[in-house]
Amino acid sequence: MNATAPIEVLVLYYSRSGHTADLARRVARGVEEVAGCRARLRQVPPVAPVTQTAAPPVPEDGAPYASSDDLRACAGLALGSPTRFGNMAAPLKYFLDSTGAEWASGALAGKPAAVFTSTSTMHGGQESTLLSMMLPLLHHGMYLVGLPYTEPALLRTSGGGSPYGASHVAGSQNTPQLGAEERELAQALGRRVAALAVRLALAGG
């Protein structure tokens, strides 16, 4: 591990109404609470009905769009998406489907990863969405990090958060802000990914 170079954790997300982006920023804050770690916040562009990128190269707001270079350079990954019928949103799936070269080269193998999501309703498919995002990460050979019940907020939350990852219940009007426990759990998830990335780097991968 290079003592002068920070370990970068890629926080990669798709967000339509802004709630998943809010979670991503909290995860990134948790990453940067770990000494020697830095978060790289990136989003994926929307896709058109014909399943191709449907946005200019530079987003109008939010984080820059992700590239394959971001994946190869990261020491850990936190992946976020709103739910779409209990699954990840199409733009994130489209991006992940394009990572065959990284899979073939093992670029992500042996790196820690975590997932986060937001839904409009309490039972709108949070856990199935989190699990759907884990599948490609397992194919990439990543170490999955969740949220254990040693995190006090997981016992207190009446909104988002589960052992599978951080989450947020946005409400049917997409208006509520992240709750206190949701914020706490998102930051805890970022810390856990970053801490494992540091341990793996110190151990030589």
Predicted regions and their residues:
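Glycine-rich phosphate-binding loop at the start of an alpha helix
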Residues: L131, P163, A180
